[in-house]
Amino acid sequence: MIQPESQFFLFGMGDREKYIYKNKSLIRYKDNLCIYSWDGYDEEFIFDEYTVILSKKGEGRVVLCENETGFFVNDQCLSESKINLPTFEGFKYQKQLKILHHEILVNIIDGKPVPNYFVYNKPWYRDGAMMGMVLKITNNLHLIKDWILSLTELYDYNNQMAEPDNLGQLLYLISLVSNKDNPLVEKVINEAKRISIDGKLTGITDGSDHTIYSTQWMIFALKALGIENDYFKIPNKFDDYARMFWMDRQGVERETFFDNKYNWLYPYLWWAVKHFENEPIDESLLQITYPMTWEKQASQAKYENIRQLSNIYADNQFSAPHTWHGAEMFLYLIEMEK
């Protein structure tokens, strides 16, 4: 985890205006305009309450706080809209879940779920689908419903090619807010069959052949839509991405050589495999901090754009918070409670 120049906090969950708090200033994201500055004030961060408190002797205090109604500076509401913020009362990892939920919600911009809104300007179907699983649990699907229903492309083309796992991810997204009668469903299934051999999706995902992973997504999404499947089948071959698909382990052999070494570049991959294997998590990876999630050296991220938040982040090709990482952590911690 790379530390920025100074502690920051992002305000503007869901479809609210985005604001950056850092260096005792509140900056509006869209035009980089400093709205408030509190030089000489002491600051206190309460990450799991989405709150920053500034105080100065003789001047009283200023409270920046975001809740289910809006984002407030004391009694002034800077952005208002309804979102659901569960307290996760009674959960072992209550504070972590609240922070992770925030890191997902804050990366919904203009109704679109993106991995990190500084370095990615459009959604990825995979990250969006994982975010959708979280939003379903927290009753916040209304935040991305319009985006899902507006989709027309079968692939997101974010890696400059048509990646087969996108098809199942798109179908799953549709299942969250619509049903099998959605006009895109038939097109997706026909495309999946077109690129399949013996019921197994073919093609390149993340630069490699991940046939099992892509087919897993398709079967999972059809089940979510209530569509009977007698065509797509899990292939009998090795695919290291298969162990990331914890949503349905059927037909996938557990691997005996799982590398426990943490993936500091793409931690969501490590978390997904941990979830699949039902492995315990080292408590050092669950410390209360902010942000809790990140990605480093991703090929399609525009890291220069995150200088607005941190020069150190930009120089190190680092973005935080990150929604796929956040979703994998959140969903495993939720399952661990069961």
Residue spans for each PLM region:
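Low-complexity, Ser/Thr/Pro/Gly-enriched N-terminal "stalk/linker" regions
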Residues: M1-P123
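Generic low-polarity alpha-helical segments
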Residues: M1-Q3, M13, I27, I53-S55, ...
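Non-catalytic carbohydrate-binding regions of carbohydrate-active enzymes
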Residues: E5-Q7, D15, P235-K338
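Polar/charged alpha-helical tracts
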Residues: K18, L54, V62-C65, P183-E186, ...
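Aromatic-rich carbohydrate-recognition surfaces in CAZymes
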Residues: T87, K122-I234
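Extended, well-ordered alpha-helical scaffold segments
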Residues: K92, Q96-L100, N139-D156, K180-D198, ...
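Intrinsic-disorder/low-complexity, polar/charged segments
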Residues: E103, N107-I108, E163, L225, ...
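Alpha-helical support elements that line or immediately flank enzyme active sites
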Residues: Y120-H142, L170-S178, A221-L222, M244-E255, ...
